[in-house]
Amino acid sequence: MASKIGSRRWMLQLIMQLGSVLLTRCPFWGCFSQLMLYAERAEARRKPDIPVPYLYFDMGAAVLCASFMSFGVKRRWFALGAALQLAISTYAAYIGGYVHYGDWLKVRMYSRTVAIIGGFLVLASGAGELYRRKPRSRSLQSTGQVFLGIYLICVAYSLQHSKEDRLAYLNHLPGGELMIQLFFVLYGILALAFLSGYYVTLAAQILAVLLPPVMLLIDGNVAYWHNTRRVEFWNQMKLLGESVGIFGTAVILATDG
């Protein structure tokens, strides 16, 4: 009996570490995909979301925070720094007005950014630590969970009001309109769980199971988003990387919630 409990605990710790790896490496992929995206725009004489001098500082801060988080050095402080850096850069890109996106694409982009910020706040609370030396900050974790709930509300909203997202589900998932409504209800219930703070572990476990097929069939269908919906290739790859980071957050909360 004790050996079964020990092996189960070991497996949960291994899965939790996997979630931490996916989340802490997310900024590296974000910076790489942004560099590739802005290189493509430069060839077409188009501007990046953030002016170039500030862009280098922004990416430098992201890589710095990601590096320290990855090595586990002052992870809580640098996770908080990563959340702050991402919030500032997103706000700067939004008010800059250098690039104009469709409303449906803004919802997809900014909702994922909110979820990643929430993931960093969860990490800053002490969740996902293999050997926790300090007590966990419940306020930071609750705030991060609220951000995840906001993301899920945005996803549910897109399923009802964005024809681009609806077609992505209709074309690549069986069940048609019934499947869309089931996903809408499921996203709504999960959002309520994260926003209220009740059944968070169960909600995170369901989300961790739900996200991989959605990432593979919906976000991973680059041909649909790039060729049909004219989403820039590296922008879609950035969104896909953020979905992986959100999955990492769900795994952390599912195993250490």
From Swiss-Prot:
UniProt xrefs under PANTHER family: TRANSMEMBRANE PROTEIN 101 (PTHR31034:SF2)
Source species of the chain: Homo sapiens
Main location group: membrane
Location(s), subcellular: Membrane
Presence of keyword Ubl conjugation: no
GO biological process terms, semicolon-separated: positive regulation of canonical NF-kappaB signal transduction
Name of protein: Transmembrane protein 101
The UniProt record lists the keyword Transmembrane: yes
Transmembrane feature ranges: 21-40, 52-72, 77-97, 110-130, 139-159, 182-202, 206-226, 233-253
UniProt xrefs under Pfam families: TMEM101
Cited InterPro entries: TMEM101
Lineage: Eukaryota, Metazoa, Chordata, Craniata, Vertebrata
Protein purpose: May activate NF-kappa-B signaling pathways.
Topological relation to the membrane, as annotated: Multi-pass membrane protein
Domain of life where this protein originates: Eukaryota
Keywords: Membrane, Transmembrane, Transmembrane helix
A Gene Ontology cellular-component term: membrane
